Swiss-Prot record:
Record lineage: Bacteria, Bacillati, Bacillota, Bacilli, Lactobacillales
Reaction it catalyzes: tRNA(Ala) + L-alanine + ATP = L-alanyl-tRNA(Ala) + AMP + diphosphate
Name of protein: Alanine--tRNA ligase
Signal sequence, renumbered to the chain: none
Cell compartments where the protein resides: Cytoplasm
Gene name of this polypeptide: alaS
Cofactor comment: Binds 1 zinc ion per subunit.
Principal place of residence: cytoplasm
GO annotations of cellular component type: cytosol
NCBIfam families with a match to the protein in the record: alaS (TIGR00344)
C-alpha cells in the first residue's frame, strides 16, 4: 500500500475517475444553493440531486467529486470515537443513466488494489451486500474477491422517502486482530457491531428503483435511467493509508493538534485522554469552512450549529488551560492543510478570524451569565431542601450556555449536590431525534419524469428577439408526448424561443403564441428548463396546436423590461453592498420580479440606516451616470481574469455569460438586462430585515414603483404636516420635537402626582404591621395603575423602619402583579415571590432585597395574601 498525503489521495481519486471518462465537479459551498430542504450540504450526492431525479440532464453522465460536507447529528461522539467528525470530505463517483453495477464494482476494485493506484492488499478488503442482490455478489467474485470476504447484510438497501433507491454494497478494510481484542472476527461485520477493526471506506449505491412509501419494496418500479451513487470518506481512507490509529493522527488533523499543544502547553497523548484536542481540531475545521462559505454563528438553523460548535471547542480549550480566545488563531493552520484543493479558507482568513474571535469573546460573556444561572438553580434547590439538579436544567445549561455536563457536575459537587444524568440524556436524545428527523426530511429526491427526460430535441433561446417565428418540436399533455393539443394546459418546446425560462433568480417571461394568420392560439403563463435544457413553455391552449407547425412567439415586452430593470439594479446593489459593507456581503439568494427585487446576502448584523442610505445613494448615482450594460460570452477562465463575480456554490459550464456595468460591476449571469443603467430610472430600498442567522434581506423597487414609493412617503408626511399645522414639510421635525417635549413634561407631572398619591396611600398600608416567627411584615392588596407604582410603594417603605418584609399585590387589567421586598438576610425576596406566584398561576423572581411576579388568576389574590404568613 502506497504512502501518500491526504492531498495526494484526494487527487489520485479524481485522476482515476477522470481516466474513466468522468467530469470532475468542484466542491461547492457547504451552504446549499436553491435547496431549502437541506441545512447543510451533507454528502457528496447532495449537490447532484437535480441529476439523479432527472430535473436536469448533465453534460457528462459520469461525474466525480471531492465534496466537503457537514453533519452534526452525532456531534456528541466527536472525540470519543476514532472516526466521528462534524465536517468531512466525501469522495464520490456517479453515473447518471450511464454505466451500472458491473463497471462500478470492477473499477472500484481496480482503484483500490491496482499497483498503479492505491495498491491495497486484496486480502484486507471485505464487502457487504444486500442478500437479494445476487448480481453484486457474483460481480465481486468475477473481479477476484474471495467468497469468504463477501458478507450479506439485510440493511444494505438505500432509500430516503420517495425517489431513487436501491441496494448498496460496502467495502471494508481489515486492520487486523490488534483492533479486535476479543477476537470476534467477521461477526463484527455480519452483526453490525461497532468496532475499530473493519473500517468502512466506501459505499456503492446501485440506484435502480423509484421508491414509493405507499407500496412494499418488492413492488418498486425500475428507474427509467439507473444510476450509481458512491461515497468514500477521505478521512477514513487517509487514516488507513497512513496507518493511523484514528482519523485524528493523520495530516488532516495533526497540524491543528500541534498548534493546540503550543497554545495550551499540554501534550497530545495518542493512548491517553485526548478528547479535547480532537474536538477542537474537528470543530475549527467546520467553523473555518462554514464561515468561509457565508454561514455565521447565531441562535437558529445553521447559525445555531456553528455557535454550538464554537462553544464546545472553547470549553474544551478551557479544559486544556486556555482561558482566552484562541480558536481564531487556528484558522490559518486549517487553511494551509486544505489549501491545495480549498484555497477559500486562506483567501477569507481575515474575515473568518474576525467572526470566530468575536464569537469567542461573546461566549465568554455568556459563560458568566450561565454561571449566574447555575448559582440561582443551586440556591433555589437549597431553599427547598433538595440536592439534585434536574435534567432539564442541566440540558439548558448545556444547550443555551454551552456548559458541558461535566462542568455542571463539578458545580453540583461543590454545592454538595448531584445532577440528574438520566433526565439530561432524555433531553439530549429528544434534541438528537429532532435533528435526525429534520435531516431525513431534507434527504429525499424527487421521482424521475421519464417523459421529459426522453425529449432531446434542440431548442435555442434568443436573447435579442421579443417576437419570432419558430417550429413547435414537442408537445407534452397529461405527462405524455402527443402530436397535437386543442384545449387545456400543455407544455411546449420550440426550436427557437424569445421566452426566458425562470433561472438565476429571474422570473419567466409571459406572452402569446400566434398561428400563421396572426390568431391567438395560446397564452404562455410560465417557462421552465426541461431536464435536457430546453425552454418548456406552460400554456393555456385556446385553439388547436400541432407538432412541426410554425408559430409566432411574442413575449410581453412591458413585463420583460420591468424585470430587466430589477435584474440590472440587483447587480448594482450587489456591488454597492461590497463597497459599503465589505466583500463578505455576498449573494445568498435573489428574486427579480416584475414589481420588485429581493436580494439576500451574508452579513453578521443589521444594516444601519446610514449604511442603507449610502447603498441606495450609490446605486442611484450609477443609474444617473447612464452606464452602458454589456454582455460578453467567453470561457470561465477568461471571465475570472476579467474579475467576474461568481456565486460560490453555483455550477458554471465551460462557456459563460459575463454582464458588465462599466468598471463598477462584473458578474457571471445568464439573465436579461437593460442596455443602459439610465433605463432603470430610480432605485429605492423599501425594507431591510434578517431572515436567518448571518443572512439579511433587502427588498427594493425601481422605476415607476420607486417613484410611487417616494410619493407614498411624501403623502404620509403631508398628512402629518396637516395634522401638526406645519405650513412646510421641513417644519414637521421641529413640530414633533415640540410635542415630544410637551409629552415629557406631562409625563413628569403625572409621575409626581402618582408619587404623592402613592405616598398618601402608603401611609395607610404601612400602618398594618404583623409579625410571625420574629419577622415583622406588611401584606396588602393595593389599587395602582401599573407595576411601576408598586416599586414606588417599596421605595417609600425602604425610607423608614416600617417592617422587615413587604408584600404588595395589585389587580392591573386582567393580570395580577406582585412585589416582595425584604430588609433581612433571613428572607430572600426572589425565593419568596417564586413560592407565592404559582398561587395566582404566575411566575416571578428577583434579587434578595426586591422581586416581582406576574400572574393571571385574580380570583386567587386573597389566597396569596393569606399564604404569606406561612412562608415566613
Amino acid at each position: 500500500m502506497k504512502q501518500m498525503s491526504s492531498a495526494q489521495i484526494r487527487q489520485m481519486w479524481l485522476d482515476f475517475w477522470a481516466s474513466k471518462g468522468h467530469s470532475v465537479e468542484p466542491s461547492v459551498s457547504l451552504v446549499p444553493v436553491n435547496d431549502p430542504t437541506l441545512l447543510w450540504i451533507n454528502s457528496g450526492v447532495a449537490t447532484l440531486k437535480k441529476y439523479f431525479d432527472g430535473t436536469i440532464i448533465p453534460e457528462n453522465p459520469r461525474i466525480t467529486n471531492a465534496q466537503k460536507a457537514i453533519r452534526t447529528n452525532d456531534i456528541e461522539n466527536v472525540g470519543k470515537t476514532a472516526r466521528h467528525h462534524t465536517m468531512f470530505e466525501m469522495l464520490g463517483n456517479f453515473s447518471i443513466g450511464d454505466y451500472f453495477r458491473d463497471e462500478a464494482i470492477t473499477w472500484a476494485y481496480e482503484l483500490l488494489t491496482s499497483p498503479e493506484w492505491f495498491d491495497f492488499p486484496a486480502e484486507k478488503l471485505y464487502m457487504t451486500y444486500y442478500p437479494d442482490d445476487k448480481d453484486s455478489y457474483n460481480r465481486w467474485i468475477e473481479v477476484g474477491v474471495d467468497p469468504s470476504h463477501l458478507i450479506p447484510i439485510e440493511d444494505n438497501f438505500w432509500e430516503i422517502g420517495a425517489g431513487p433507491s436501491g441496494p448498496d454494497t460496502e467495502i471494508f478494510f481489515d486492520r487486523g486482530e490488534a483492533f479486535d481484542p476479543e477476537n470476534i472476527g467477521l461477526r463484527l461485520l455480519a452483526e453490525d457491531i461497532e468496532n475499530d477493526r473493519y473500517i468502512e471506506i466506501w459505499n456503492i449505491v446501485l440506484s435502480q428503483f423509484n421508491a414509493d412509501p405507499a407500496v412494499p419494496r418488492s413492488e418498486y418500479k425500475e428507474l427509467p435511467h439507473k444510476n450509481i451513487d458512491t461515497g468514500a470518506g477521505l478521512e477514513r481512507l487517509v487514516a488507513v493509508i497512513q496507518g493511523a490509529k484514528t482519523n485524528f493522527e493523520t495530516d488532516l488533523f495533526m497540524p491543528i493538534i500541534r498548534e493546540v499543544e503550543k497554545l495550551s502547553g499540554k501534550v497530545y497523548d495518542q493512548d491517553g485522554d485526548n478528547m479535547s484536542f480532537k474536538v477542537i481540531a474537528d470543530h475549527i475545521r467546520s467553523l473555518s469552512f462554514a464561515i468561509g462559505d457565508g454561514a455565521l454563528p447565531g441562535n437558529e438553523g445553521r447559525g445555531y450549529v456553528l455557535r454550538r460548535l464554537l462553544r464546545g471547542a472553547s470549553m474544551h480549550g478551557q479544559k486544556l488551560g486556555i482561558n482566552e480566545p484562541f480558536l481564531y488563531k487556528l484558522v490559518p493552520t486549517v487553511g494551509k492543510i486544505m489549501e491545495s484543493y480549498y484555497p477559500e479558507v486562506l483567501e477569507k482568513r481575515d474575515f473568518i478570524e474576525k467572526i470566530v474571535k468575536s464569537e469567542e469573546e461573546s461566549f465568554a460573556r455568556t459563560l458568566h451569565s450561565g454561571q449566574h444561572f447555575a448559582e440561582t438553580i443551586v440556591a433555589d434547590l437549597k431553599a427547598k431542601g433538595q440536592n439534585v439538579i434536574a435534567g432539564q436544567d442541566v440540558f439548558k445549561l448545556y444547550d443555551t450556555y454551552g456548559f458541558p455536563v461535566e462542568l455542571t457536575e463539578e458545580i453540583a459537587e461543590e454545592a454538595g449536590m448531584t445532577v440528574d444524568r438520566e433526565g439530561f440524556e432524555v433531553a439530549m436524545k429528544e434534541q438528537q431525534e429532532r435533528a435526525r428527523a429534520s435531516a431525513v426530511k431534507g434527504g429525499s429526491m424527487g421521482m424521475q419524469n421519464e417523459t421529459l427526460q426522453n425529449i432531446t430535441v434542440e431548442s435555442v433561446f434568443n436573447y435579442n428577439a421579443s417576437q419570432l417565428p419558430s417550429k413547435l418540436v414537442a408537445i407534452v399533455a397529461e405527462n405524455a408526448e402527443v402530436e397535437a393539443v386543442s384545449e387545456g394546459t400543455a407544455s411546449l418546446i420550440f426550436a427557437e424561443t424569445p421566452f426566458y425560462a425562470e433561472m438565476g433568480g429571474q422570473v419567466a417571461d409571459h406572452g402569446q403564441i400566434l398561428d400563421a394568420t396572426g390568431n391567438l392560439v395560446a397564452t404562455v403563463t410560465d417557462v421552465q428548463k426541461a431536464p435536457n435544457g430546453q425552454a418548456l413553455h406552460t400554456v393555456e391552449v385556446l385553439a388547436p396546436l400541432a407538432l412541426n407547425q410554425e408559430y409566432t412567439l411574442a413575449i410581453d415586452t412591458n413585463r420583460r423590461h420591468r424585470v430587466m430593470k430589477n435584474h440590472t439594479a440587483t447587480h448594482l446593489l450587489h456591488a454597492a453592498l461590497h463597497n459599503i459593507l465589505g466583500h463578505h456581503a455576498t449573494q445568498a439568494g435573489s428574486l427579480n420580479e416584475v414589481e420588485f427585487l429581493r436580494f439576500d446576502f451574508t452579513h453578521f448584523q443589521a444594516v444601519t440606516p446610514e449604511e442603507l442610505r449610502a447603498i441606495e445613494q450609490q446605486v442611484n448615482e450609477k443609474i444617473w451616470e447612464a452606464i452602458a450594460v454589456e454582455t460578453v460570452e467567453t470561457d470561465i477562465d477568461t471571465a475570472k481574469e476579467m474579475g467576474a463575480m461568481a456565486l460560490f456554490g453555483e455550477k458554471y459550464g465551460k462557456e459563460v455569460r459575463v454582464v458588465t456595468i462599466g468598471d463598477y460591476s462584473v458578474e457571471l449571469c445568464g439573465g436579461t438586462h437593460v442596455g443602459n443603467t439610465s433605463e432603470i430610472g430610480l432605485f429605492k430600498i423599501v425594507k431591510e430585515e434578517g431572515i436567518g442567522s448571518g443572512t439579511r434581506r433587502i427588498l427594493a423597487v425601481t422605476g415607476k414603483e420607486a417613484f410611487e414609493a417616494y410619493r407614498e412617503q411624501e403623502d404620509a408626511l403631508k398628512a402629518v404636516a396637516a395634522t401638526l399645522k406645519a405650513p412646510q414639510l421641513k417644519e414637521v421635525p421641529h413640530k414633533v420635537e415640540g410635542l415630544q417635549e410637551q409629552l415629557r413634561q406631562l409625563q413628569k407631572e403625572n409621575a409626581e402626582l402618582k408619587e404623592k398619591a402613592a405616598a398618601a396611600a402608603a401611609g395607610d398600608v404601612f400602618k398594618d404591621v404583623k409579625e410571625v416567627n420574629g419577622h415583622r411584615y406588611i401584606v396588602s392588596q393595593v389599587s395602582v395603575s401599573d407595576a411601576g407604582a408598586l416599586r414606588t410603594f417599596a421605595d417609600n417603605w425602604k425610607q423608614k423602619d416600617y417592617s422587615d418584609v413587604l408584600v404588595l399585590v395589585a389587580a392591573i387589567g386582567d393580570k395580577v402583579n406582585a412585589l416582595v421586598a425584604s430588609k433581612t438576610k433571613d428572607i430572600h425576596a426572589g425565593n419568596l415571590v417564586k413560592e407565592l406566584a404559582p398561587i395566582v398561576d404566575g411566575r416571578g423572581g428577583g434579587k434578595p432585597d426586591m422581586a416581582m411576579a406576574g400572574g393571571s388568576n385574580q380570583a386567587k389574590i386573597q389566597e396569596l395574601l393569606e399564604a404569606v404568613a406561612g412562608k415566613l
